[in-house]
Amino acid sequence: MNLIILFQNDFIQKNYARINDRRSDHILNIHRANIGDQLSVGILNGMIGTAILRKINGAEIELELELGLGLELETDVDVTSKVNITSPYTKQPPTPLPLTLIIALPRPKMIKRILQTCATMGVKDIIFLNSYRVEKSYWQTPLLQEDKIQEQLLLGLEQGKD
């Protein structure tokens, strides 16, 4: 995980986020982060920047973010009052590649890997299509459900930072 992706519901106040799922487990056990350590973070469909680990409470952690403008929370939190706009750690995500991947639907085992790899490489548009050799049963796989696709794309995004 090269980028910790934060969601709207992770924010507890202006520039503080609290996470207690697989991301916090990864930060504590893989990164072996301690209080005061800096981590790369990004808001889904928003800015990329850094966060400082401020609190560890079991499997729950709190991060203080420095992400800049472009943070549009769906809550009543005012994020513009404590944001350092001139921070060297704040940046826009890379410009999307002008690329569309058109691919015949692969075996269900390969769907996860393809989605993760495409997200890691920055591919924004993926089109699965039917072809002569595609088994009709492949279209019934649960891996093509929206939440499963989203999960694999997020895993790839965490690696590629794009």
Label the predicted regions.
Residues 1-91:
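N-terminal positively charged helical leader segments and presequences
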